[in-house]
Swiss-Prot record:
Domain of life (superkingdom): Bacteria
Name of the protein described by the UniProt record: 3-dehydroquinate synthase
Record InterPro entries: Dehydroquinate_synthase, DHQ_synth_AroB, DHQ_synth_fam, DHQS/DOIS_N, DHQS_C
The reaction(s) this protein catalyses: 7-phospho-2-dehydro-3-deoxy-D-arabino-heptonate = 3-dehydroquinate + phosphate
Chain's role: Catalyzes the conversion of 3-deoxy-D-arabino-heptulosonate 7-phosphate (DAHP) to dehydroquinate (DHQ).
Entry cofactors: Co(2+); Zn(2+); NAD(+)
Free-text cofactor note: Binds 1 divalent metal cation per subunit. Can use either Co(2+) or Zn(2+).
Phylogenetic lineage: Bacteria, Pseudomonadati, Pseudomonadota, Gammaproteobacteria, Enterobacterales
Gene that specifies this protein: aroB
GO molecular function, one term: metal ion binding
Keywords: Amino-acid biosynthesis, Aromatic amino acid biosynthesis, Cobalt, Cytoplasm, Lyase, Metal-binding, NAD, Nucleotide-binding, Zinc
Binding site for NAD(+): 71-76, 105-109, 129-130, 142, 151, 169-172
An example Gene Ontology biological process: chorismate biosynthetic process
Residue sites binding Zn(2+) per the record: 184, 247, 264
Localization: Cytoplasm
Amino acid sequence: MERIVVTLGERSYPITIASGLFNEPASFLPLKSGEQVMLVTNETLAPLYLDKVRGVLEQAGVNVDSVILPDGEQYKSLAVLDTVFTALLQKPHGRDTTLVALGGGVVGDLTGFAAASYQRGVRFIQVPTTLLSQVDSSVGGKTAVNHPLGKNMIGAFYQPASVVVDLDCLKTLPPRELASGLAEVIKYGIILDGAFFNWLEENLDALLRLDGPAMAYCIRRCCELKAEVVAADERETGLRALLNLGHTFGHAIEAEMGYGNWLHGEAVAAGMVMAARTSERLGQFSSAETQRIITLLTRAGLPVNGPREMSAQAYLPHMLRDKKVLAGEMRLILPLAIGKSEVRSGVSHELVLNAIADCQSA
């Protein structure tokens, strides 16, 4: 069992990583006997895990209600958020309730925002079931829903009480979802840890076959990196922005193509190549390093070009609505070397458009 602490003073919390955690009531601390829980999951995961998690919580004396949401990025919306509020109010659940997010990034982000908003804030626990959510979205307290004009535009910073990562969940993950998660894994190597990127080049095949020790190390390292960044910059005023490598381009793809048509990790993968091409055009990143990124993403089964039906010009309106925009100016996360990156302002739209075009004609 691995345990990492996200250090935020009184709001610090543990990330527990192991197999078989759904069999242990102690995994779900700080829940105690007699407490009330609303378990939030989706229609795909409910048949796999709902009864198991409900059973282990009830074994610990916890009172459990549940709400099952439709599955898909297109349902990360205000309308679906309202169904969670309705379920909480119908019982009713008070300010002493705990929300448990059992699912991937959509369930985790939406449940976290529900917890941040319901009666001005109730406790919640993240139980991520996808690789993407285990290595990234469940850690750090970013909660949100989408708007038709932009991804994650309505949300809050709100930290969980704990994160429970059961490695056994990956056994039921479709290959496309596994690849999507690997995009965020590869991102950490590009922006922060060149040695980890080297390790990924050597061990990607083991991750694709869900080798236990390799996957446990991979998730632990990603969570360590994320925890360090969040502890240093919880509200994304500086360092934490680096975690958005590929996301400015990727969110544009998701919004333009319709949420759910491109998985988040797929869009981020293409976006990371666009960021690398942008950095190349600025003369601060080598084509050889871009090729290393492309090769690793391709081996993971991820796209390295944008959608053919999306023109370079179609990216700009979405990118100019990005949350990192300041005074109307785009701020891009760009690699400087494998393992090192920067937040860059003042890049001309023409250069960005040419970099995007590089990734359409490649």
